[in-house]
């Protein structure tokens, strides 16, 4: 009997270990990002990228958060509320921003159409049947997009790098894609081509005098459990004849805001994240909160800012309307600078 019981325990342990090893092997093969190979820099140690300032919480902190979550309210929005079809092109010195959802915006400037972190999928997850799902439809129908010339992908998290959407854009529009180091190989693995990868402060040149510079952000990267920080993360500055536009991607607070503002002054418009910031003890290193977004507006010297990264996916403990409420309080406390909250699908010409 003792030997039989021992055999059962050993068999169960072997099955558990085998299952864990199997899951690890599957996630490495199908989900993990390929490793970047390049020279050591102040933000790459030869194996993994890092922030110039402290980066992200430990796995233990993540488990603590998961065990003690206090989620804010996220009501359902079952009926899509699509905005009007954007104009085909915008020129004559105009700058038009359309907020589509989450960090997906359409930037139209100098007859060039640019998408940031495009996401039209129902879930932002390695699989289609589980993981964070959207609480409202994208504000613009995919088929209503104008011709897309350029796509900016800030990092490899699923709510920013949606390979299904990128494949659809490639098929329909054939845009150039600009992304930080290491992400081009990951995209090619998923059948997405025409991606140019750059390091912080490097610049890609496009039609109509448009340049795109990869700029620092304080964040991290991961597609699976085993590939933390193999690929770089970033923001972007679009430099056009009609002015500079800054898209922050995902970022915590850091000195990079002032540095970007100094290098690209004056910045005509900034797109700054305001959501997924609670609880602060956990999110603070990688996500600014609404008050810090207002601070970033001033540090960058922005003429106008637009809020992004809210109202679509419940990724932090903040509720759907908490970011807007907290942003309005911070704006009122700082003299109400020009910082816009657009409705999903709303487009607006900026000064």
Name these PLM-found stretches.
Residues 8-12, 28-38, 42-46, 142, ...:
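Cap/insert and terminal regions of metallo-dependent hydrolase folds
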Residues 102-110, 206-267, 284-291:
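Catalytic core of the metallo-beta-lactamase
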Residues 118-120, 156, 217-219, 249-251, ...:
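Active-site metal-binding loops of divalent metal-dependent hydrolases
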Residues 120-137, 220-227, 278-287, 314:
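Acidic/histidine-rich helix-loop elements
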Residues 129-179, 194, 265-271:
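Active-site metal-binding motif and surrounding structural segment of the metallo-beta-lactamase
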Residues 164-169, 190-191, 256-260:
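A short acidic, amphipathic alpha-helical/loop segment
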């Amino acid at each position: 009997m003792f030997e039989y019981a021992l055999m059962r325990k050993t068999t169960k342990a072997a099955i558990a270990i085998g299952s864990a090893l199997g899951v690890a092997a599957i996630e490495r093969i199908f989900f993990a990002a390929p490793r970047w190979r390049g020279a050591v820099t102040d933000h790459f140690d030869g194996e993994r990228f890092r922030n110039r300032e402290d980066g992200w919480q430990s796995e233990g902190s993540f488990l603590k958060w998961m065990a003690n979550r206090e989620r804010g309210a996220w009501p359902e929005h079952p009926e899509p509320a699509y905005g009007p079809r954007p104009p085909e092109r915008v020129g004559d010195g105009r700058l038009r921003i359309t907020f589509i959802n989450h960090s997906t915006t359409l930037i139209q400037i100098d007859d060039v159409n640019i998408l940031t972190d495009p996401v039209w999928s129902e879930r932002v997850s390695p699989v289609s049947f589980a993981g964070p799902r959207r609480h409202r439809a994208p504000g613009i129908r995919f088929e209503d997009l104008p011709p897309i010339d350029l796509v900016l992908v800030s990092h490899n998290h699923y709510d920013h790098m949606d390979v299904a959407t990128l494949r659809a854009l490639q098929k329909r529009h054939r845009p150039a894609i600009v992304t930080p180091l290491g992400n081009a190989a990951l995209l090619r693995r998923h059948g997405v081509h025409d991606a140019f990868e750059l390091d912080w402060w490097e610049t890609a040149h496009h039609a109509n005098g448009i340049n795109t510079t990869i700029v620092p952000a304080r964040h991290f990267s991961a597609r699976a459990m085993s590939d933390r920080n193999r690929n770089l993360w970033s923001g972007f500055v679009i430099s056009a004849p009609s002015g500079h536009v800054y898209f922050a991607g995902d970022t915590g607070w850091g000195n990079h805001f002032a540095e970007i503002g100094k290098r690209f002054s004056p910045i005509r418009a900034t797109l700054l994240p305001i959501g997924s910031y609670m609880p602060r003890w956990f999110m603070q290193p990688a996500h600014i909160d609404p008050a810090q977004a207002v601070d970033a507006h001033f540090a960058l010297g922005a003429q106008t800012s637009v809020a992004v990264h809210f109202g679509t996916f419940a990724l932090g403990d903040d509720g759907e309307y908490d970011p807007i409420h907290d942003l309005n309080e911070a704006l009122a406390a700082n003299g109400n600078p020009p910082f816009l909250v657009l409705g999903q699908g709303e487009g607006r010409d900026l000064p």
